[in-house]
Amino acid sequence: MAAATLFFLAGAQHIMVSEAFACKPCFSTHLSDIETNTTAAAGFMVLQDINCFRPHGVSAAQEKISFGKSSQCREAVGTPQYITITANVTDESYLYNADLLMLSACLFYASEMSEKGFKVIFGNVSGVVSACVNFTDYVAHVTQHTQQHHLVIDHIRLLHFLTPSAMRWATTIACLFAILLAI
């Protein structure tokens, strides 16, 4: 009887354990009441051919015939997703701009994780806006990539259209704007 009870309790504990998430905070306690809504774009599918590293004046057909398809080029097929994030700003001082910068950094992180195949969930974790992914999937991904000992870049970042220089200028301008608002 004791063994049966022990097995029952162990089984109940396994059922009650919730899913673990690895979260990256957006470093802001001034944004609260986070709500997200992800909906699929109804009625259509996207086929996107990303041509990259093609010499100037060479067409896609000529490149495929002469060189084959480059490993850096991808064709993306899928249904676009509309993601709505709603947040209330509780402090209207210079921290408002800092909050927006931190949130944009979180969105870049989320786009990278989404590009790698993770389902990103935004949530309020202990009062801090965070981008979360499934912990088991994250550990498997890190383990897989740390076991590979080569540093070949075999993908391009589809969602990153801003260069590091543009991001530095955007950060500088936003910080100057925050200082002017504080004065």
From Swiss-Prot:
UniProt name for this protein: Glycoprotein 4
Topology within the bilayer: Single-pass type I membrane protein
Keyword terms, alphabetized: Glycoprotein, Host endoplasmic reticulum, Host Golgi apparatus, Host membrane, Host-virus interaction, Membrane, Secreted, Signal, Transmembrane, Transmembrane helix, Viral attachment to host cell, Viral envelope protein, Virion, Virus entry into host cell
Membrane-spanning segments: 158-177
Virion surface side: 23-157
Function comment: Minor envelope protein. Along with GP2a, serves as the viral attachment protein responsible for mediating interactions with CD163 thereby playing a role in virus entry into susceptible host cells.
InterPro entries for the chain: Arteri_GP4 (IPR003412)
GO biological process per UniProt: symbiont entry into host cell; virion attachment to host cell
Residues listed as glycosylation sites in the UniProt record: N37, N88, N124, N134
Residue intervals annotated with topology Intravirion: 178-183
Signal sequence region: 1-22
Family the UniProt entry places it in: Belongs to the arteriviridae GP4 protein family.
UniProt KW Amino-acid biosynthesis keyword: no
Subunit composition and interactions: Heterotrimer of GP2a, GP3, and GP4. The GP2a-GP3-GP4 complex associates with the E protein. Interacts with glycoprotein 5. Interacts with host CD163; this interaction plays a role in virus entry into host cell.
GO cellular component: extracellular region; host cell endoplasmic reticulum membrane; host cell Golgi membrane; membrane; viral envelope; virion membrane
Compartment(s) of residence: Virion membrane; Host endoplasmic reticulum membrane; Host Golgi apparatus membrane; Secreted
